[in-house]
Amino acid sequence: MLKRRRVAVLSPVAWRTPPRQYGAWETVASNVAEGLTARGWDVTLFATGDSVTRATLHAVVPRGYEEDRSVDPKVAEYLHISEAFEHAAEFDLIHSHYDFMALTYSRLVRTPVLTTIHGFSSPQIMPVYEKYRDGYFVSISDSDRAPGLRYMGTVYNGIDLSLYPLRAHGGGALVFLGRIHPDKGTHLAIAVAQQSGRPLLIAGIIQDSEYFREQVEPHLNAQIRYVGPVDVAGKNALFAEALALLHLNTIPERFGLVLVEANAAGVPVIAMDLGSCREVIADGETGFLVRDVADAVEAVARVGEIVDRVCRERVERLFSVETMVAGYERAYQAVFDAEDLR
């Protein structure tokens, strides 16, 4: 039986944990900390000072640098990460959700570090992973793995299902929910809406202003609307109006938390068949996997085949906080076992 021990959960400091609106990594770190705490672990969450948690909160950065532009990102990150590692001896495990930066501290402490890789943001960061390839890693999908790293398993991201209730009924609008960026294919969602004759609601932060001005804003009208960033309540309001969620990435998806959130509410997802989408969406059951805009337009005509309850039941089975935390407990045990053999 796994012994509950002392765990430090290291969350990013771009946004509050959990985030008010955007912030997938912070969302997952929060769900891990809350889920572990509920299962009896002694958890300390390293996050911004305005974060909300039932675990012990340890903070040296008052607010996220994306929310308070007076906070210098590099200064905040180095103070935050170094603070966690200076307290490493107080924990049996550090669970990092911090990409490659925290890895550079991992050999300076005796406490084992497990890193959840939320995505390889660019080829330029790979030398860090290559140097620390003998560390402990978890992937968030089988598709998003790098060769040569020591993986303790794949643990799918889990959501708090109470935040995304099954909707009473759907609407007739297509919904895009994510960063306004070429990688997320906002322009493709617009094309699908135009060709299918359906209204489109676009929600999310504008991460690429030039892209928004050139490929999104000129198409905004009564049919295609940009509603800005949304919080959980805003997402649920969109899901209530949704015929389907369009997730037409132009690059391989690492996981796609919004796919799970939409399915939890009973919303079918039309997703580009790239990266993890095949793991998250059951083609023909919880949505449709497509190759291009033409495929997506055909899928819009078929969304009536998808049953809301089936979508939610799959999320309950595979993508709940409880399922995720159980997966991390197995990964923690694998780390502890490996450490015992050293």
Go through each PLM region and give its residues:
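Catalytic cores of nucleotide-sugar-dependent glycosyltransferases that transfer UDP/GDP/TDP-activated
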Residues: M1-R342
